[in-house]
């Protein structure tokens, strides 16, 4: 079946790296504890993984690299070590065939031990994806301490340069009561907004220093438990059409946002649930797909 006749396939994966390679207490320990996984990467990729100071970051980098190779090799039917990503003109990782086609578009995000992968196989022309994951509890103690010392308005001001003016006003208007419960709820709104914006920006492929970032607004943003309707995105005050931006809970402590831009002719793809992926499945596939 030719690509033109193929229907798009949405891929939504998540890997929890916390239980992986438990004997690796330092990054250098991965050379033995994760030798099987590392052997499925090029020397350049291995060096990129092992340069991280914290082993938790190295494990996430390793899982992310394997996720991308697995998806490309499996869904594009290419040998494992030919499943290489390059960077486009905006430095976004892509997989491009010699013909110039992109049979798989994808985006990866990782935070607090979790790697999240969103991709579309055989995407219609113009379709784009972005994904971001946040873990509000990861910085909870530090955030609560900051709120106790400096207050909510000051906390928002510290991060105001990465949000739109309307978003800053919306955050400040929350003015949470000075209780742990009230501050926790406000922080969930803060991280929900952060996650939504990141996914959208990653979808566009533009850098975080894009000139339009201050003109971007997630209108009436909310964490998953308070989100009543589809997320509306505005740019310079006007609603952005043809983009589906969502926020959903993941496991117990995470939120994940997906941003999908319709194809040039309005084609849409349907999201499902994120599926937990077993590292053994990736390694077994990689070993088989890397054999001559």
From Swiss-Prot:
Gene3D superfamilies xrefs: 4'-phosphopantetheinyl transferase domain
Keywords, sorted A to Z: Transferase
Protein's UniProt keywords contain Disulfide bond: no
GO cellular component terms listed in the entry, alphabetical order: cytosol
Phenotype on disruption: Leads to lysine auxotrophy. Impairs the production of the gamma-pyrones fusapyrone (FPY) and deoxyfusapyrone (dFPY).
InterPro entries for the chain: 4-PPantetheinyl_Trfase_dom, 4-PPantetheinyl_Trfase_dom_sf, AASDHPPT_N, P-Pant_transferase_sf
Top enzyme category: transferase
Annotated GO MF terms: holo-[acyl-carrier-protein] synthase activity; magnesium ion binding
GO biological process, one term: lysine biosynthetic process via aminoadipic acid
Alphabetical list of Pfam families matching this protein: AASDHPPT_N (PF22624), ACPS (PF01648)
Enzymatic reactions: apo-[ACP] + CoA = holo-[ACP] + adenosine 3',5'-bisphosphate + H(+)
E.C. numbers: 2.7.8.7
Keyword Cytoplasm part of the UniProt annotation: no
Similarity-based family: Belongs to the P-Pant transferase superfamily.
Summary of the function given for this chain in its UniProt record: Transfers the 4'-phosphopantetheine moiety from coenzyme A to a Ser of an acyl-carrier-protein. The enzyme is able to transfer the cofactor to a broad range of enzymes with acyl- or peptidyl-carrier protein domains. Required for primary biological processes such as growth and asexual/sexual development, and activates target enzymes involved in the synthesis of metabolites such as fatty acids, nonribosomal peptides and polyketides such as the gamma-pyrones fusapyrone (FPY) and deoxyfusapyrone (dFPY).
Protein's UniProt name: 4'-phosphopantetheinyl transferase 1
Organism: Fusarium mangiferae
